Amino acid sequence: MERCDGVMFAARYDPEDGKRESVSEDTESERESESGSESESESEKETESESEKETESESESETGNTGKTGETRKSIGLESVSDSDSDSGSQSRSDSDVEMKEVDASNSNIVSDSSKHKSVLKKLRTSLSAQKAENSTSNSDSDESSVPTHDLAPLPQPALPRDQRLTATTNHIGNLDWLATPIYASTTETVPFSSFGLSSSMVKNLQSNGFSSAFSVQVSVLKLLLPDMESQAIRPDIGGDLLVNAATGSGKTLGYAIPIIESLRNRIVPRVRAIVLVPTKPLISQVKATFAMLSKNTNLSVVSLRSDISINDEAQRLQVVPDIIVSTPGRLVEHLTNGHINLKSLRYLVIDEADRLLNQSFQNWCETLMSRIDSNPISELDQTWRPSVQKLVFSATLTTDAGRLSMLKLQRPRLIIVNDRHELVNELFTVPATLQEYKLSLGSARSSAKPLVLAKFLMSEQKLVNTLVFAKSNEASLRLCRLLQLLFRVFGLDVTVSYLNSTNNAASTRAKILKDFANQTVHILVVTDLIARGIDIATITNVINYDLPNSSRDYVHRVGRTARANQDGEAYTMCFGKGETKWFTQLVREVSRQTEVKDVEKGFRDLVSREDEAKYDTCLEELQRQVFEGV
C-alpha cells in the first residue's frame, strides 16, 4: 500500500485501476517538476501545499459526514492486501461488494479533486508568466533610459503640397483686382445727352420725354460702354463686363438702355441680342416702356415675358424673333428649357436689381443661363473676332461677395461706384444724395397708440400728400390703412388712404392704384416690402417706415422710392423703445450717405393730446365692429 499527499491507492485489481494510476502518475510528475524547478520561490511552494490541503479537506468532506466511510476505505485496503485470495462466506462477499462500490465512488471523487488541482496550478503558471513579462518590460524601459538625451529642436519638415494651393489662391485674388480698384463717380455730375455723340433719333426721343441731361450714373456708364461699342466694331473681344453700384432712382435703366439701342439700331436680321432680367412684374413693365420709348423710329422689337401670361401664348409671340427681351429669371428659364429662345446671337445680358436676383434661385436660373450661353463651343480665332456676351450688372445694394459674383462668370469686369465717399465694403449700400433722413423715437409704452402717433405726425408736419408708408406685412398694412381712414375722418380731414400688397396685386388693380397715387387722387399709400421695388413714381416726396425694415438692404430700397432723379425727398423712421432705436442705429451705419440721420425733436405729448386718445379709442371700437360684421 502506498500513500501520496493523503490519497491511498490499493493494489487490488479494479476496472478503474488504470485511470487511478494515470491520475496518480500525473499528480506525482507535476509535483516532481515543481519541486525540481530552481526558479520557483518559497512562496510558490507554500501556495501549492495550501492548495493540496484544500483539496484533501474537500475530498474528506465529500466521502462522508461522520468519517466512517474513510475508516471503511482503510479496512477495505487492508483486507485487499492480506486476504486477496480467500473468501470468508456469503456475508463477507456481500460486504465486499458494498465496499467495492464505495471504493469506486471514492475513486471518482479523487479524479475530480485532481482536475481542480490542475486548474489551480494552471492559474499559478499564468500568474508567473505575467510576472516574467512585466519584469522583461521594466528591463526594456531601463535600456531605453540609458539612451543619451538631447535638447528639444524642431523636426525637419518636408515640402508641403499646400504651397501650390497658396499660389493658386493668390492668382485668384489677382483676378479680383477690379474690386479693389473701382471707378468712383460723383453723385452731382450731369452732362447733356447731346455731347455723347448719340444718334439724332435717340436725342430726339430723350428730349421729347423730358431728358436733356444725363445724371451721374448715366454719365459714367455711357463713357465706358459707348467707346466699347465703337471698338467692338473692329475688335469684338475688346471691352469687358460692367458692374454698377448706384442709389435707387438714379436713372440706371436709361444708363443701360441707351447704349444697347445705339448698338443694335443698325442690325439687319432680327435675333435675340439683348436680355434684361428684373425681379418683379412691375419692373418688367417699366423697363419695357423705357426701351419702347428710346427705340422709336427704329426697327428694333421689344418683348416682355411674365408669369401671368400663358407660356404657350408667349411662345407664339416669340416665333416673330424679338431683338430685346425683358423678363423675370424664372420665366426665361422656362422658355429656354422648352427651346423657344435661341441665344447664339446674344450680345448683352443685363441684370437689374442684381442683389435680389443673386440671392434667390428662380429655378437655378443663373447656372442654367450661363451654361446655355457657354454651350456654343467656339475656337480661339472665333473668340477674337466674334462678339462675346457682355454682362451689365446694376444694383443699389451691389454685393462684392466673390462667391456670388463668380456665378456670373464675369470677363474683364469693371466696377463703377456712384458715391462721393471713396470706400468699398462687402455690401455697397447707398441712398440718394438729395435724401434727408429722420428718426422719430418714443417710449415703448406708446407703441399701443402707434397709428395715432403716425396720423398726428403727418398732420403736424403737413405730410398728407405724396406719402408712402411701409408696413411689415399684409395684415399690418390693411389694419393701418383702415385706422388712418377712420382717424382722418374723425379729425375732419379729407385725406384718401389706400394700400397695395400681395392681396390686391393684380395687374389692373395695381396699375389703377399707382396711377391714382401719382395723380394725387390717393394721398397716402400703405405698402409692404414685396411691392416696394416696383414703384417708380417721381412725385413721391415722403417715405415713412411705420415698421422697421429687416435689413440695411430693405431700408435702402424703401427710402429709395423718394428723392429720385436728383429730386428732394425725406424719409422718416418710427422707433418705439430702446430696442428698436438700437437696431435702427446699427442698421443705418452700414449705409453710405451724404448727410447724417437727424432726430425729430418731438415727444408723445407734443403730438397726442388726451382728446386725441379718446378719439383713437372710438376708432378702434369702430374697426372692431367692422371686422366682426365683415364690413
From Swiss-Prot:
UniProt cross-references to SMART domains, sorted A to Z: DEXDc (SM00487), HELICc (SM00490)
Keyword list, A-Z: ATP-binding, Helicase, Hydrolase, Nucleotide-binding, Nucleus, Ribosome biogenesis, RNA-binding, rRNA processing
Binding locations of ATP: 246-253
GO biological process, one term: maturation of LSU-rRNA from tricistronic rRNA transcript (SSU-rRNA, 5.8S rRNA, LSU-rRNA)
Residue ranges, compositional bias (Low complexity): 80-93
InterPro entries referenced in this protein's UniProt entry, alphabetically: DEAD/DEAH_box_helicase_dom, Helicase_ATP-bd, Helicase_C-like, P-loop_NTPase, RNA-helicase_DEAD-box_CS
Motif, Q motif: chain positions: 191-219
Gene3D superfamilies membership: P-loop containing nucleotide triphosphate hydrolases
Biased composition annotated in UniProt, kind: Acidic residues: 24-41
Subunit structure: Associated with pre-ribosomal particles.
Known function: ATP-binding RNA helicase involved in the biogenesis of 60S ribosomal subunits and is required for the normal formation of 25S and 5.8S rRNAs.
Protein name: ATP-dependent RNA helicase DBP6
Record organism: Meyerozyma guilliermondii (strain ATCC 6260 / CBS 566 / DSM 6381 / JCM 1539 / NBRC 10279 / NRRL Y-324)
Organism ancestry: Eukaryota, Fungi, Dikarya, Ascomycota, Saccharomycotina
